[in-house]
Amino acid sequence: MAKLSNDELIEAFKELTLIELSDFVKKFEEVFEVTAAAPVAAAAAPGAAAPAEEVEEKTAFDVILEAAGDKKIQVIKEVRALTSLGLGEAKALVDGAPKAVLEGANKEAADKAKAQLEAAGATVTVK
């Protein structure tokens, strides 16, 4: 039997009906003792959903100051109000953005801090 190129095989498959192609796949699986890959992909989907559930159950959040914005002095004041930092330390934190303002805060405290910092003109993310 002559060896067919990939292009020749594709052209041969194009001429088959769906039923003939399905029969070919079944015969191919029997002869080479393989199965379709679809069940493997279906088994991987539930595993991918598990990390999303863990994120929803997260209880400790970090408030990250991404940028101070135009009102840098107001942002420094808010950082001082949210933390126990002195003026120099708060200024260094704001100048060194992106940096964490709060770490390990609960959801309510993190959202409150984010709102206060954004009201002062900062760009903030909660992780």
Curated annotation (Swiss-Prot):
User: What Gene Ontology cellular-component terms does the record carry?
Assistant: cytosolic large ribosomal subunit
Please verify whether the record's keywords include Nucleus: no
Mind telling me which Pfam families this protein's record contains?
Ribosomal_L12, Ribosomal_L12_N
Q: Which UniProt keywords are given for this protein, alphabetically ordered? A: Ribonucleoprotein, Ribosomal protein
Which one GO biological process term can you cite for this protein? Answer: translation
One Gene Ontology MF term: structural constituent of ribosome
Q: Has UniProt tagged this entry with the keyword DNA-binding?
A: no
Please give the InterPro entries that the UniProt record associates with this protein.
Ribosomal_bL12, Ribosomal_bL12_C, Ribosomal_bL12_C/ClpS-like, Ribosomal_bL12_oligo, Ribosomal_bL12_oligo_N_sf
Q: Which HAMAP family does this chain map to?
A: Ribosomal_bL12
Which purpose does this protein serve, as stated in its record? Forms part of the ribosomal stalk which helps the ribosome interact with GTP-bound translation factors. Is thus essential for accurate translation.
Under PANTHER family, the record lists: 39S RIBOSOMAL PROTEIN L12, LARGE RIBOSOMAL SUBUNIT PROTEIN BL12M
Subunit details? Homodimer. Part of the ribosomal stalk of the 50S ribosomal subunit. Forms a multimeric L10(L12)X complex, where L10 forms an elongated spine to which 2 to 4 L12 dimers bind in a sequential fashion. Binds GTP-bound translation factors.
**Family, similarity comment:** Belongs to the bacterial ribosomal protein bL12 family.
- What protein name does the entry list? Large ribosomal subunit protein bL12
Q: Which organism is it from?
A: Clavibacter michiganensis subsp. michiganensis (strain NCPPB 382)
